[in-house]
């Protein structure tokens, strides 16, 4: 187990309300998060599990309801890492060239390493990938 693996914080149930107005390392803020039964589509019209809008360093997430705990956790890791990577002009070198598959792989790795997404684990995620500050 590496140093990052020692910080595994696993919550039994993910309460999305704990992420509202959450300040993350790197100066990012999750201003809102909601679950929806409405269809979500990505920028090119494909069905999506989630959609994140980033205005500067503020994120608003909409996630399809009905996901199981693991799917919700991986989705949170994926959306936050991707949003952080595109929200700033010069993201860390380790994520600069990430594509959708890379974000998904990183999200699965984060879930395997730290367990269910939580405020502390999302901060570990952004720190691990090189986002620093606030």
Predicted feature residues:
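Metalloprotease/metallohydrolase-associated module, dominated by Zn2+-dependent proteases
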Residues: 2-71, 87-134
């Amino acid at each position: 187990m590496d140093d990052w693996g020692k910080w595994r914080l696993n919550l039994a149930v993910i309460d999305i309300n704990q992420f509202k107005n959450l300040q993350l390392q790197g100066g990012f803020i999750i201003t809102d998060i909601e679950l929806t039964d409405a269809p979500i589509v990505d920028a090119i019209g494909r069905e999506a599990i989630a959609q994140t809008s980033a205005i500067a360093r503020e994120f608003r997430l909409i996630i399809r309801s009905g996901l199981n705990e693991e799917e919700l956790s991986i989705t949170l890791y994926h959306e936050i890492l991707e949003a952080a990577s595109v929200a700033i002009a010069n993201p860390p070198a380790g994520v600069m060239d990430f594509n959708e598959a890379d974000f998904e792989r990183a999200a699965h790795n984060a879930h395997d390493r730290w367990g269910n997404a939580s405020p502390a684990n999302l901060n570990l995620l952004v720190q691990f990938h090189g986002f620093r500050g606030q």
